[in-house]
Regions:
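Flexible, polar/acidic helix-loop-strand segments at domain edges
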Residues: 5, 57-129
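Long, intrinsically disordered, low-complexity segments
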Residues: 1-47, 119-126, 157, 169-246
Length: 246
């Protein structure tokens, strides 16, 4: 928390007197935590990764294990940071709906003993360095500065690659369309389950296409904008007009 790469994050805390307070803490982890019983009762299990999300990661990308949590809900398995992914196998926790829990909302077991299992002490990261670098890549590419965009993209991929030259090869094309697709892909995996994907899809104008292809047919073009509160429209005395189709 509050690392050198944190641009803006909401500060949260738990205390002995207020271990689970939404006044000094947040429900960020509780809402997304592993939903189970006993020691696996870590939250509500919302905002889960899909099979499509899992398939988006390139072979060997370490960000997959840092994003998607593979759990075998068993009260006989101890919880440690080391046994929350690969030892459980790479398959969804629920074969029925093909979803994965969000590892970025997985809390420190030692702190659970002190402050409850639901992670009210975890800060909420709003903007981080990787996001900003990919913003720069996207902006440069849309301005036709493809060489600059490629360099920004490689900064993110190189960091994820680490010392393993066999994964995440450099994107060498300077074609604007190819780079656009590569940058959009990189945002999906670098920022996976950090709550920005929907807004990216809307911003790119492809929300209907992508969501409908994933079976989320409830999304309609009007949902790109939120409805204006009627009270505010009334107070504006005709200045504000309701967004289309609301």
């Amino acid at each position: 928390e509050n690392s050198s790469e944190s641009v803006f994050e909401l500060q949260c805390a738990s205390t002995a007197a207020l271990p689970a307070s939404d006044k000094i803490g947040s429900q960020f982890c509780e809402v997304q935590g592993v939903r189970g019983s006993g020691q696996w009762d870590l939250g509500w299990g919302w905002h889960m990764g899909t099979e499509l999300m899992g398939e988006a990661f390139e072979p060997g990308d370490p960000r997959k294990d840092a994003t998607l949590l593979y759990f075998r809900r068993s009260d006989t398995d101890p919880i440690t940071p080391e046994n929350t992914n690969k030892p459980y196998g790479e398959s969804p926790v629920s074969q029925a709906d093909g979803t994965y829990f969000n590892k970025k909302a997985y809390t420190n077991p030692a702190l659970r003993e002190e402050f409850t299992r639901h992670g009210f002490w975890v800060n909420i990261r709003i903007i981080r360095y990787g996001d900003v670098v990919l913003m720069a890549a996207e902006s440069a590419n849309e301005l036709g500065k493809t060489g600059e965009a490629s360099n920004y993209l490689e900064m993110v991929r190189a960091r994820a690659r680490g010392n393993n030259p066999d994964i995440l090869p450099k994107v060498t094309s300077l074609d604007q369309t190819v780079l656009r697709d590569a940058i959009r892909h990189e945002r999906r995996v670098e920022l996976g389950l950090e709550s920005g994907r929907f807004y990216d899809l809307v911003r790119w104008g492809i929300a209907s296409q992508v969501l409908h292809a994933a079976g989320k047919t409830g999304y309609q073009p009007k949902n790109a904008l939120l409805p204006l509160p009627q009270d505010e429209i009334d107070k504006s005395k005709g200045v504000l007009v309701q967004n289309p189709d609301y």
